[in-house]
């Protein structure tokens, strides 16, 4: 399998899922967009696209002009080529915008280890049918996808009290996942070094919030790693058919 990974900051990669892909011998091509990497002109060689999180937001095209091209290439991969896509956090929001939604500020920001509740359509979904009806996942976002109701090719799979579109899919090959289960033991401390992430965390919980958040994440790490393993296994068998 050949995978193209769109990254917006080096420390936000597919994490635990990346380790699983490497163990399976998959060929990974990482495009570090914030560092000036360009998306290849020809996407035909890639079986899968991952689109990860980042400290910028989808509307920041003037500050980050590469976002314009990124959205075009996601549209090409998902809508035109109809190839498998997984988008996490910012990647989820980029997919949402590409398929006709709007990305708006969350009220309030969603930060912490929080509940995600699956909906009825989860039971017949290829990726998430074996997940429990409620899971704990790491949230660290201040924007979210809205206004996808009129797109009949969108299925809403999971929500939280703050964010309606925690998981949605376009047709049956492209998924937006607003939360994080792909994290590892070092993730929270690594992300806490990013000024935008740290300020959002401390604005909500005060000074010293990072240490508490890290401890809470590690207490839930085994479960999130298990969910990542299930997601990856189902992605291989049900979406890629391997």
In which residue ranges do the predicted regions lie?
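Catalytic nucleophile loop
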Residues: 78-102
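Extreme N-terminal starter segment of soluble prokaryotic enzymes
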Residues: 1-4
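Acyltransferase
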Residues: 183-242
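Flexible gly/pro-rich beta->alpha loop and the following alpha-helix that scaffold active-site loops
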Residues: 19-85
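Pocket-forming structural segment of enzyme catalytic cores
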Residues: 100-186
